[in-house]
A protein has these predicted regions:
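A generic local secondary-structure boundary/capping motif
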Residues: 8-9, 40, 85
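Short Gly/Thr/Asp-enriched flexible loops that form oxyanion-binding sites at enzyme active sites
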Residues: 17-36, 63-64
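Short, acidic/small-residue loops that bind anionic groups at enzyme active sites
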Residues: 28-49, 78-80
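Anionic group-transfer/hydrolysis microenvironments
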Residues: 13-15, 25, 58, 100
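N-terminal small/polar loop signature for handling phosphorylated ligands or for N-terminal nucleophile
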Residues: 1-22
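Short glycine/threonine-rich catalytic loop with a Thr-x-Gly-x-Asp
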Residues: 12-14, 28-33, 109-112
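Phosphate-binding and adjacent anionic-ligand microenvironments
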Residues: 45-163
Length: 163
């Protein structure tokens, strides 16, 4: 991005279902914000006054706070693309995704797609004369730590009984 004096940059994973975005300063925005930027552009384009978006439980609350500010709501699903899609179908939601950079737009198809996400982020960027870093900074700022905890040897049923 910096070498080419680009306004923004994109990186996709090997099977192209997730997208990471880089601003004009060469700063990765974090894949959590791919979905937030997509929802921002979606709301602006369609003039949505209230809608339901779906994300999984492993997604930061930045999307929830942004949606609430725009009279919209976020419903959560279990982790996994199929769980997000099933919840979208149940709620008749048009847009969902995961905090891993995966965006799902019903209008295109019910699966994560980095090209859909690229289009939606470019749409959001085109709605403003501000650089992407300023658009990003205007969004609710939250971080999420994703880690695994080893529970070998712990009997989960017994653990919850004692609490």
């Amino acid at each position: 991005v910096l070498e080419n004096n680009a306004d923004l940059g994109f990186a996709v994973d090997p099977d192209a279902d997730r997208l990471a975005v880089v601003d004009e300063k060469g700063r990765p925005l974090g894949e959590e914000y791919t979905l937030v930027l997509s929802v921002d552009g979606y709301i602006n384009t369609l003039g949505v006054e209230s809608d339901i978006f779906v994300s999984n439980l492993s997604t930061s609350i930045a999307l929830d706070k942004f949606a609430l500010k725009n009279n919209c709501k976020v419903e959560r699903s279990a982790v996994g693309e199929i769980n997000v899609v099933n919840k979208m179908n149940k709620l008749d939601s048009n847009l969902g995704g995961e905090g891993n950079g995966g965006v799902i737009l019903r209008e295109c198809h019910l699966g994560r797609d980095s090209l859909v996400a690229v289009t939606m982020v470019l749409n959001r960027a085109a709605q403003s004369t501000s650089p992407l870093s300023e658009i990003y900074n205007s969004l609710p700022q939250f971080e999420i730590v994703k880690d695994k905890v080893n529970v070998d040897g712990i009997k989960i049923d017994d653990f919850f009984k004692s609490k």
